[in-house]
Structure formats: structure tokens, C-alpha cells
From Swiss-Prot:
It comes from Sus scrofa. The keyword NADP does not apply. Cleaved to give an A chain and a B chain joined by a disulfide bond. Might act as an inhibitor of spontaneous calcium carbonate precipitation. GO terms for cellular component: extracellular region. This is Lithostathine. The keyword Mitochondrion does not apply.
Amino acid sequence: MLPSMSLPSLXWMLLSCLMLLSQVQGEDSPADTPSARISCPKGSMAYASYCYALFITPKTWMGADMACQKRPSGHLVSVLSGAEASFVSSLIKNNLNALSDVWIGLHDPTEGLEPNAGGWEW
């Protein structure tokens, strides 16, 4: 676990934002496999009927979330299956260096400043 003093600075080290261009479906979705038929905007990649884009822009979690929501049906990614985790992981590994951090939908709204404030949120 990171000391609470390092957590606020982590937000400024952020180099990436992941965006999901459609509503997220759960593990029981029949579309858990990659689909070659979906058409995504330029700079996005299709997986399981959804479009994913990786943005290399320094932002806080809130800033990244707002930037994603400005796009059609965009949200920070919520990883709901092992297959989706593998896809997202490979997207990050193929586009960023090993020292980069990314934001996803799960976050600590207190940025570690209040350890007993209720925990993580989507």
C-alpha cells in the first residue's frame, strides 16, 4: 500500500485515460469475445462490441472521467471479466512504457487522504 502522502501526487503522474464508448455489460454478456464487425472511431480499438481508446494526457481521475464523458457514450473503463482484463492490459502494454499509470472507473474519491472514508467507488 502506498503511504497517504504519495497518493495525491499519483494523480499528477497519470499519463493515460481509458475510455469505453458504450455502456458496460457484465460477465454474463454473450459478447465476451472480440468482434471484428464493430466499427470504431479513428484511434479506437474494438473488443466485444465496444470501442476502447487510450489517451496519453496528464489528468487527475476526475479530469480523465470528465474527458471521457465528453465523448459519445464515453466512460472510464470498468473491467468486468478476465477476457476484458487481458484485452485492456495488452492495449496498455502495446501503447505505453512500463512506468506509465492509467485511470480506470474504480477510484478512491479521497485520494488516500481519508483511509476510513468508505473505500473505492465506480
